[in-house]
Amino acid sequence: MAAKDVKFSSDARDRLLRGVDTLANAVKVTLGPKGRNVVIDKSFGAPRITKDGVSVAKEIELKDKFENMGAQMLREVASKSADVAGDGTTTATVLAQAIVREGSKAVAAGMNPMDLKRGIDLAVAAVVKDVKTRSRKIATNDEIAQVGTISANGDEEVGKIIARAMDKVGHEGVITVEEAKGLDTELDVVEGMQFDRGYLSPYFVTNAEKMVADLENPYILIHEKKLSGLQPLLPVLEAVVQSGRPLLIIAEDVEGEALATLVVNRLRGGLKVASVKAPGFGDRRKAMLEDIAILTGGQVISEDLGIKLETVTLDMLGTAKTVTITKDNTTIVDGAGVKADIDARCAQIRATIEDTTSDYDREKLQERLAKLSGGVAVIRVGGASEVEVKEKKDRVDDAMHATRAAVEEGIIAGGGVALLHAAKALDALSPANADQKVGIEIVRRALQAPVRQIAENAGVDGAVVAGKLLESSDADFGYNAQTGVYENLVKVGVIDPTKVVRTALQGAASVASLLITTEAMVAEIPEKKPALPAGGGMGDMDF
């Protein structure tokens, strides 16, 4: 076992703070409408230019092990925000840095770190409650477009395209973002279905960089039970190999010999195959498999219907134009099902929705209906160069997730103003002791950080802007960094999804309070490898 280096108390926290600052300073320059770009070197190909906070955070790895720990903890804040709300990564990073900085000062001054943490938790709960009460529901397409525009860093075209996509497939529909071949960004709506089951083995992946399995024009075997033995599968596998097309297997589970054989075939290139678990459970699983069968023009292979796996022929398999499988989701696009059958199935589900008394059942039936009828919207992002397309695609992705979050939990004033004004909710709190009160004050100061950073990125003094906004009693009054005007931000469409703001603060406080309570750090001491000995001379080489 390699020797370890151990750091304690202030020395440990100083190293952590240096790592936090390095990552946060690189990320926070991207915040706001006048945020700058960050150029990321790639080991192959052109450098990547991005304004997406989480993309910058993911690229940062520091040489010093202890500083790197701080940076990685902060990276976790950005990733969590991206996973839960799809946006707000830079805001979360700025908040976390502010809480860690203030918290470290308080700990150095002799405060109790655990009481500080309790104070921070109290304050965050109060702010989240305040933000939720001021949240308003989103109704019109224009509001959806505004959220998209803000999240795409002021790009109106992106906002409008996302609003159109959500209009076409409904709020429950699936929207994916791809790179276009040309200059223009366009919207395609394709009939399709997505369910929340990913590939059973990473060996099925066809695109290793994105960890995605893409199958073009595949056969789809829909099986109700577990597949563990190889023998029953052989006839259908041989038929598919002869056809030269890929195969997707959807079953309750694929394990043992069957899974091993599929993986070996995939790796050796004999058969392009992927398998996923069937979505849902119990009777709902049966119904969803029927949905997939109708959508793809196949049959559910079920013992109840008297169909054995050994007797399956190619005409019993479904087909689709493309199937995309990630670690969490499977999307079937352009299934070969008959439109009349799909419409009949949708009508049947609608009738069941009207009859059902359970809210849970109704919600699940609505999901199935959206998957069958909503289709998949594809936004193809265009640009003059590959670098530009990649940068724009990042922004479209952010904007799409932000609009989803806005539809889910509503909107509030943007530009960091919601958090700034939510600080007033902290006045009503009654902490148990003086150290907890300091924890609350740490959050109060941190809530100003996003507004200050947005202003500073726009070339204005952040402290002056924050001071002016705090004088106002109107919670929607803020600084529009795009135009440089103080105004009602909701009226001019500078809005943020409530979910994004809430997630950013909760994630930031969670990680930051853990960093403050750190008292010791352990890291491996890198081994110094001895230099190789010089090569000996070769005989008979003296000319």
Swiss-Prot record:
Biological process according to GO: protein refolding
Lineage: superkingdom: Bacteria
Subcellular location: Cytoplasm
Enzyme class, broadest EC rank: isomerase
Pfam family, one: Cpn60_TCP1
GO molecular-function terms, A-Z: ATP binding; ATP-dependent protein folding chaperone; isomerase activity; unfolded protein binding
Record carries keyword Chaperone: yes
A Gene Ontology term for the protein's cellular component: cytoplasm
Catalysed reaction, written as an equation: ATP + H2O + a folded polypeptide = ADP + phosphate + an unfolded polypeptide
Residue intervals passing through the bilayer: none
Alphabetical UniProt keywords: ATP-binding, Chaperone, Cytoplasm, Isomerase, Nucleotide-binding
EC number(s) reported in the record: 5.6.1.7
Primary residence: cytoplasm
Positions annotated to bind ATP: T30, L31, G32, P33, K51, D87, G88, T89, T90, T91, G415, D496
Role description: Together with its co-chaperonin GroES, plays an essential role in assisting protein folding. The GroEL-GroES system forms a nano-cage that allows encapsulation of the non-native substrate proteins and provides a physical environment optimized to promote and accelerate protein folding.
Similarity remark: Belongs to the chaperonin (HSP60) family.
Self-association state and partner proteins as the record states: Forms a cylinder of 14 subunits composed of two heptameric rings stacked back-to-back. Interacts with the co-chaperonin GroES.
Protein name per the record: Chaperonin GroEL 1
